[in-house]
Regions:
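Conserved, mostly hydrophobic/aromatic
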Residues: 35, 58, 134, 230, ...
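Extracellular and organelle-lumenal recognition/adhesion modules and their flexible linkers in secreted
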Residues: 1-276, 293-295, 310-322, 328-333, ...
Length: 564
């Protein structure tokens, strides 16, 4: 009250009488509380994905970051010493999807080093082991032993191992380092012991202690913080990332699976780079490790409604994006097949299907049991969208009726896209739609009846992105209480609202494109917000039925009743 004497004037204790009518029970969805992960705010590379080396693939490009010329293939790399040079080459790469690699021309043995400081430094823990790997070959000379050091910011070596780079063809080398002390901002140092010209790529450093101990896994403390929410599902990879900035930037799930060196990196529309080391297979594994349903989201044949990028296509026709265009119709059959192939990758027989075999080759012969798939995200419901969405929806429904398709109704709780999106869902019989809205706490207080009047015969609702926003965008007690209050109304409408997920989820200090977020972090700390504990309260104490009740207050204030 001292902080806000106007709004909280004349507050007094309130006595409430609650009468429960057990005969008016509604089932609450078992999937009500989940999480939505998008690579925004460095949520993946430099965040949840445990890789410690930045730009390990030498694929950074100025177009990742608004044509920033410093954001290039050598970003995050430096040469220590004057007797070596670093350049970038593209002849005979490891894989066409990974065309750039480093050429480290060493003219003085043992005196020069190739350095990488990771994402704002490399955090290390004393006694813990780290997996190092690189692909290398010798372009000139014989090559030889290469020292690999972990170096603290004062220059002290706090971990060392060695590999041999002598092959004339690409060959992967692996080693393990043990940190001899803690470090907050260490660097990786690669020191050739022989004068030669080396080609290097996919230089990686991974903690062995990842979430559930998985190789190519997730940062243990961040992943555990998410798991502690007890999410019933995970929506991924976006959001705007899913349908991208222009057609060429649509998230191609096939480019995110398979050997890491063969994955296709992608510009992140939030202004940085996606290695896609955290790809679809890893998302499925994360869901499995938490006991959560996977909810992948694929573009509905159109890019993000805010796209500013133009793209060339198969007929060299310049097509400007946004919702002014979509995937050319002559390419839609292949795109639809890609959607169907994803379902086969998740659920297909490991011996009898092409993509089921690929899943097994990745180490997971058992199906992931995919039950939901999102098509579209906050799209403008234009004729271009409708035509393509219908094609995809009909194909999935015909081939996989067991999979629930989740449609979209735009980015707001009202307006043209919301109304037309709902009309389209009703016309096609879409079983669930994805609603998004970011609103003031007052809206949540005064719209607790929002879903009371929804037609129960129509599509179920997935409230896929929501949050209470105040001026300055804090995540505080006021926003958390408003969200908690609104979730009680959502539970009351558990026969309509099937799923909910707060957004955004993660934000790294110094690399934030959006506020508020549920969890803030740096390389050594994870800081859940007040809103996190609202989500955790509902996730860890999920109800199965809503019992109708009435509340009587001793002061009769309706304004207070809305907040109880």
């Amino acid at each position: 009250t001292e902080q806000d004497p106007v709004r909280f004037a004349n507050l007094k204790p309130v006595e409430a009488t609650i009468q429960v009518n057990a005969g008016q029970a509604k089932e609450i969805s078992k999937h009500l509380i989940g999480i939505f992960f998008e690579d925004i705010n460095y949520g993946a590379d430099g965040g949840l994905y445990a890789e410690l080396i930045q730009n390990r693939d030498f694929e950074y490009t100025p177009t990742d970051r608004g044509n920033d010329q410093n954001w290039n293939s050598t970003h995050s790399w430096s040469v220590q010493g004057s007797d070596a040079t670093l350049s970038i080459a593209t002849e005979n790469p490891i894989h066409p999807n990974n065309p750039h690699y480093a050429v480290f021309d060493v003219n003085a043995a043992e005196q020069t080093a190739l350095m990488n400081a990771g994402f704002d430094g490399i955090a290390l823990k004393k006694g813990e082991k780290y997996d190092f790997s690189l692909f290398g070959k010798v372009l000139e000379g014989k090559g030889g032993k290469v020292l690999v050091n972990l170096v603290d910011k004062d220059g002290t070596i706090i971990g060392q191992t060695a590999v041999n780079v002598t092959s004339k063809d690409w060959k992967q080398q692996k080693a393990v380092l043990t940190a001899t002390s803690d470090a907050v901002a260490a660097s990786l140092s690669i020191v050739p012991q022989a004068v030669s010209k080396y080609a290097l790529d996919m230089i990686s450093l991974f903690p062995q202690k990842t979430f559930k101990g998985r190789k190519n896994g997730l940062r243990a403390d961040l992943a555990q913080t998410l798991a502690d929410l007890h999410p019933r599902f995970v929506r991924f990879p976006g959001g705007c990332v899913a349908h991208g900035d222009g057609i060429d930037n649509i998230y191609d799930w096939k480019g995110s699976i398979g050997p890491l060196e063969a994955r296709k990196p992608l510009r992140n529309l939030w202004g940085y780079h996606q290695t896609r080391g955290l790809g679809y297979h890893e998302y499925f594994l994360f869901c499995e490790d938490m006991g959560a349903e996977p909810v992948p989201v694929l573009a509905a044949g159109v890019p993000c409604q805010n796209s500013g990028t133009c793209a060339h296509h198969s007929k060299d026709e310049l097509t400007c994006m946004g919702q002014q265009g979509g995937i050319p119709m002559e390419e839609m059959d292949q795109y639809i097949q890609d959607v169907l192939d994803l379902i086969e990758y998740a659920n297909g027989d490991a011996r009898k299907t092409v993509w089921g075999k690929k899943r097994a080759e990745a180490g997971h012969p058992k199906p992931f049991n995919l039950k939901f798939i999102g098509i579209g995200n906050e799209d403008m419901i234009t004729p271009v969208f409708v035509e393509r969405f219908k094609m995809i929806f009909d194909a999935v429904k015909a081939k996989h009726p067991e999979v629930t398709v989740i449609g979209t109704t735009g980015p707001f709780y009202e307006g043209t896209d919301y109304e037309v999106g709902w009309d389209l869902a009703t016309e096609l019989g879409v079983p669930m739609v994805d609603e998004h809205y970011y609103v003031e706490p007052g809206w949540m207080i005064h719209n607790q009846e929002y879903y009371d009047h929804y037609d129960r015969s129509k599509a179920k609702v997935y409230l896929g992105e929501y949050a209470a926003h105040l001026p300055g965008r804090p995540n505080n007690v006021e926003t958390a209480l408003a969200e908690a209050l609104y979730l009680t109304a959502v539970e009351r409408n558990g026969d309509v609202v099937e799923m909910t997920s707060y957004a955004p989820l993660l934000a790294k200090d110094g690399h934030t494109q959006w506020n508020p977020d549920l969890i803030y972090f740096n390389n050594t700390e994870v800081r859940p917000t007040v809103g996190y504990y609202t989500q955790q309260m509902y996730g860890q104490n999920a109800g199965t039925e809503y019992l109708s009740s009435t509340v009587k207050l001793n002061n009769g204030w309706d304004a207070v009743k809305k907040r109880v």
